[in-house]
Amino acid sequence: MSTSTLAPAADSPRLDWPFLIAAVLGTAVLVALVALDGQPASAALVILGFALGVAFLRAEFSFAAAWRRFLVSGEGGGLIGALLLIAVAALVIVPVAALVPGFGGAIAPIGPSVVIGAFVFGIGMQLANGCGSGTLYTAGGGSGRMLITLALFIAGSVIGSLHLPAFLALGGVDPILASNYLGPWGGLAAALASIAVAAFAIMAIARARGATFKPRRLIVIGAIVIGLLSIGVFLVGHHPWSVTFGLTVWGAKIATLAGFDFSGAAFWQWPGPKRALSESILSDTSSLTDLGMILGAMAAAAAAKPFARTAWPPAKSLLAAAIGGLLMGWGARIGFGCNIGAFVGGVASGSLHGWIWFAAALGGCVVGIRLRPLFGLSRD
């Protein structure tokens, strides 16, 4: 997260009361609206999203930075932290999704769609300096640059929704879910084993490059807390935590208000998207956690230090934020999600597509890192 957006003067008060009060009141109002809408259980998703925003910001948990440090210098602590998060979530998601009716994992077919989408997402992630969840919590935490990324992310995801059916038509392999072959507990063992193998590979690469692979204490705590909160989202929403679908719905609703007709778009005639577009966002679980996350990050930032009015970043940096957001939004929709929905949700569900997404996105990050200097951004 950019510290320039939150840098206080030496004699500034510790709290930014207006923003803190606005975030807390906004959350309370949102919870009340969801409850009054006849969905009291879903109100918990707002609270869980709020807690996720606080946890991400306080732990400075960043997928984009962790991947960049690993690729540039071999430092693996951030990636190990991400794997710990996934392992915690998998302990509940894999067996419950397999054993309890009404629950499901994050699964997707393996084909050109997931590979291309993840690769493009990886490029955008490095230009934007954040992923889907990172965009939400840094925007909520006061980063004007990330507000630009968020707006273009939303636009890109709507464009991606129009292209997704054509990419799926290219073919691929049906979803491969470990629990379908090994049962709930065998599937869990396979998921945890795959995470362990990835962790050992990261540690080996870090050692070979003379870098550290031990995550900071704050990252370890953050990973465990975020993993537990992800379990909470799963238990309440009956599906692993997702970030980008909510953003796609927001964009489509805005486009509809502007006069755009989605009746001829195949994606928006599928049952889930069609229902989300026609109903209130208060009925969409992804939207509720997204809104809660923004408000939670705002509250956490305001409770730590005042929001400072600072000059906008250079034009090149803003252009990178816009391009990165557009690429991430498009890639997330084509590739079945972002770091949260595709990587964390997929691997924690025991779905092979999660690892395919990770590998393709890592390749995209290599390209994105090489492009960063063109926009005045450091490769580190």
Task: Please state what every model-predicted region is.
Residues S2-D380:
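Membrane-interfacial helix-loop segments of redox and metal-homeostasis proteins
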